[in-house]
Amino acid sequence: MAQITAKLVKELRERTGAGVMDAKKALVEVDGDMDKAIQYLRDKGMAKAAKKADRVAAEGLTGVYVNGNVAAITEVNSETDFVSSNDKFVNLVKDATKTIAEGQPADMEAAKKLKMDDGSTLDQAFVNATATIGEKIVLRRFALEKKNDDQEFGAYQHNGGQIGVITVLEGADAATAKHLAMHIAAMKPKVISPEELDDQFITDQLAVMNHKIDQDNESRALVHKKPLPHLVYGSEKQLTDDVLAKAKEDIKAELKEEGKPEKIWDRIIPGKMQRFIDDNTQVDKHFAVLSQDYIMDDSKTVGEFLKEKGAKLVAFQRFEVGEGIEKKQEDFAAEVREQMK
C-alpha cells in the first residue's frame, strides 16, 4: 500500500479544492494514485451535488465582466448569504462570468460545456463547488451584450454584487454609461421605452397601483381627507389623441365651472394637461427607464438627460440576486433536531 504523505494530500487539495480529510480519504481509496484520486473526488462531488439538487438556492452574487466589445452578466446562487461571501464562491462567480464573456455561448447548455482556465468545464466547476463548499451552487442565468467601437459599455455592481447592471450607450462617454447603470440598479426598470411594455403588464400594474390607492384612502378617511381617485391609464401608449382631446375638454369644463375667464385658459390648460399626462403614465415612470426621473438630477427624465448629451440607450441588463425565487423559510429548531437524530 502506497504511503499517503502530506505532500500528496496538499497537491490533491490544490488541484481539486477538496478538504484535508476528503483528499486523504480519496488517496487511501485509490492507493495513492493522483489521477484516480481526482476522479474519485469528482465522482463523489457529483453524488453530493445530486443530493443537493432539490434544495433552494436563492442567495448568491451577480457577476459582470467586459471583454472588449462583449460584456457578460451572470447570477450565481448559493443556499446561504454566508457562503456567498466565501472567497471560493466569489472567485467562481468571477471566473464563470469571464469564461462566458470570452466563450459567448448561445444558451445555458452551451455555457455548461465551456472550458475554464483550469481545463474543467463550467458545469464541472459548479459540481465541484457544490461538493467542496457544501451547499447547492448553481449558475442560474446569464446574458451577453455586444457593442461596436462607437458605443460604450457601462458596468456597475451594487451592494457587494447583489445587483449587477450592464448598459450599452451610443454617443456617450464611459462616465455617462456608468451613471446610467447606477440609475438602473437603483430604479429597477424593465424596459427602455414605454412602447416595449406589454398591454397586459400595464393593466396588471394599474390594478396593483389602484389597490395601493384604496389602502391609502382608508387611512385618509380616518383623518377626514378627500379620497384619491383611481388611475384610469398607466402609459403614454394608452393616451391616444381621443383620450387627450377628451382630457382637454374636461379641463375646459372644469375651468368654466370655476368661473375662470376664458381669456386666461390658454395659460392654464398646458400645465393641467401635463399634470394629466404625468398622473396617467405612472407605469411608464416605474418600469420604462427613459420615462423615469433621472436619479442624479430629478428635474429631468432619463430620456431628457440623454437627449441633452446627444446619447442613446441601446440596451441594458439588470440582474438582482434571487429575483423570482421563492426562498425557503427555515425552521432553525427543526433543523437542529434533524441534525441530532
Curated annotation (Swiss-Prot):
Location(s) in or outside the cell: Cytoplasm
Subcellular location, principal: cytoplasm
Keyword Protein biosynthesis among record annotations: yes
Annotated stretches, region: Involved in Mg(2+) ion dislocation from EF-Tu: 80-83
Gene Ontology MF term list: translation elongation factor activity
Keywords: Cytoplasm, Elongation factor, Protein biosynthesis
Entry's Gene Ontology cellular component terms: cytoplasm
Pfam families from the UniProt entry: EF_TS
Function summary: Associates with the EF-Tu.GDP complex and induces the exchange of GDP to GTP. It remains bound to the aminoacyl-tRNA.EF-Tu.GTP complex up to the GTP hydrolysis stage on the ribosome.
Family: Belongs to the EF-Ts family.
HAMAP family assigned: EF_Ts
PANTHER family associated with the record: ELONGATION FACTOR TS (PTHR11741), ELONGATION FACTOR TS, MITOCHONDRIAL (PTHR11741:SF0)
Name assigned to this protein: Elongation factor Ts
Organism: Lactobacillus helveticus (strain DPC 4571)
Taxonomic lineage: Bacteria, Bacillati, Bacillota, Bacilli, Lactobacillales
